[in-house]
């Protein structure tokens, strides 16, 4: 069946009194009606993949029946790749959970002579087990302890992670305790805890790959770079960020499937694990602002209005109509964005409110620590200081004293970057794709923030693959970013222990930042020249756009002139050819 026809359904008497319709096709056709030879075949259209495919027999044949394999579907192949690279990632951390004799007949972790740095196996999970008092079985945020400060004083400490990440650590500790009490092979409690955490993080990354493969649309094989990224080997188990990437990817997938409330819930959960999934709401709002026609919804379609409620029956009617009203509201771009934002905010509050109410001091610890934290070793501010001897915006500070000027500068730079991205989104000749703006926002956050922990680079991996599916370029950036781990570990080892000077480490940080800026530049270029966007070939608009996908791109007369979309090169050429006739942007 190549077309879909509608036919009148006759009654039993043979008449056709109404317009009851049925589909002649077995089901409603998919929106993608391209022929089978238009499928994504990387071994044929990507030189890097073609060269790598020689290991398994070479590129796919000209007469191969693509998409007919029963078991080894693209998704299962991606899962196999992911499991292999996650196993490699676990093996890189395995050296840090080796046990040795403690001299008293017991066992202890073998971190002697800086093993965690020499073997480059360091993971925050291992020291946090004791530092966050998880080894005592205490509930996070309720438990507190006293620590000595460098100036000779003391301070009260609590769990330093957002609520969902802290609860995940607590749940992993409880699972580890259950394992220890079962007749199963045993180990140090911290070793069992690390493996439980790693298992959950592996599931989170598998979910990230699954959701990203669905977001990729016809280019499902782009998600293979997420599965086989060098950053997975180095940082999948460095911290708990795979949880946040799973929520972020599934939130974007829910948005792509036109479920804004579910998208907001998932992004809100991600924000309760790490901050960055909430930042993805910004591009959604800006793109919906550009796409919304700003016309009032007819009252007849909206159902009963609040001002018409004058009885209990009217209240019941209004409540019955609420789901339909919400669905109708979500059909508008700004309506869908509003639902997503409200759902995200509500979810974040629901997750955080119980902890904030019961243990306010413990709940505030994450925000207190990030306020008083100084520039991270591989932030741009520390890079400048390492090469110039600069003392920073605030100069020397006492322990616990917040770097107020640094915090302000970092925030202002990020806001300025977001304003620039918003201007680009509104004035681009064609509405940008959602993942393009999402990558730009997260990259701007990392580049301007005072903290860029090494595992934060995992945030960029799915977004980069979906925004810029150029495999060689992405693989080069991922390799550079992963290799920053080597000088970092030997810098932490210290020069007295045959480590490297700080500038060796910060020099590689400069290369990483330049690589990320290069990706940003390429994405901006493709936003301004959408004809060069590989995703938008074969009449594809925005696979992750949801209500934005194939939506009209109006001229937005209600916006100031400097914020309206600019003419594309094709529009400008058409206007030069027909100077006396108005050019319709949507028909060019």
What do the predicted segments below correspond to?
Residues 280-345:
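Perimembrane helix-loop-helix junctions
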